[in-house]
Amino acid sequence: MQLVTPEGKAVYPHLNEADTDFDEDGNFSTKLAIPSEHAGDLLGKLEEFAEESYKTQCKEQKKQKLKRYNHPWEEEYDKDGQATGNILFKFKMRAKTRQGVDLRPVLVDAKKNPMTDRVGSGSKIKVAFEARGWFVPSLGAGVSLRLRGVQVIELVEYSAGTSATSLGFEEEDGFESEELPSKKSKETLVREEDKSLADADF
């Protein structure tokens, strides 16, 4: 089942370069936070698909019941454990086929023009994806959301560092280091972004 999400905010996207931390072939991925009031229609379709997929897997495995694997969507909570009011969806795409052919998601701007800008967390995006059912004996029956493409409505460019300005600091009279870095490095406090983590019809 192929769908396009409503607009939401990208969370820890790996859309320009594949993440190879846990897979040498790499994966493209993003989480998408969608306000609950806008996610209802999508959730309904996915829940219905998941139930039909589960029944199919039970039939194929000749079982009345199978263990169910967690869905790749859930309520989002902040660092204090409070509900944000968003539903968090998880999308993934392998960077290579089993035959070694390179894959990557389609990236387009709001006008559907191809783009290469680095998409960072907080960008407002829509995701084109394919929902697929699967079964693995050790895990059970589940559903995956296979990333196909992303439309960027509002870009927040990825940055590997955090600037002094973005942290809210202002220039003050007082101590000044004798070992002044270049303007570029002065403005950037290195902090790597947390890595926890076919055409699209937009």
Question: Which role fits each region the language model picked out?
Answer:
Residues 137-157:
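OB-fold/S1-family single-stranded nucleic acid-binding modules
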Residues 98, 134-136, 159:
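Eukaryotic short linear interaction motifs
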Residues 1-96:
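OB-fold ssDNA-binding interfaces and closely related basic DNA-contact patches used
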Residues 30, 127, 145-148:
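Hydrophobic residues positioned within well-ordered beta-strands of beta-sheet architectures
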Residues 91-107:
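Short, basic/aromatic beta-hairpin or loop at an interaction surface
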Residues 157-202:
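Acidic, gly/ser/pro-rich intrinsically disordered tails
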Residues 106-125, 134-143:
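Exposed beta-sheet edge/beta-hairpin loop segments within beta-rich domains
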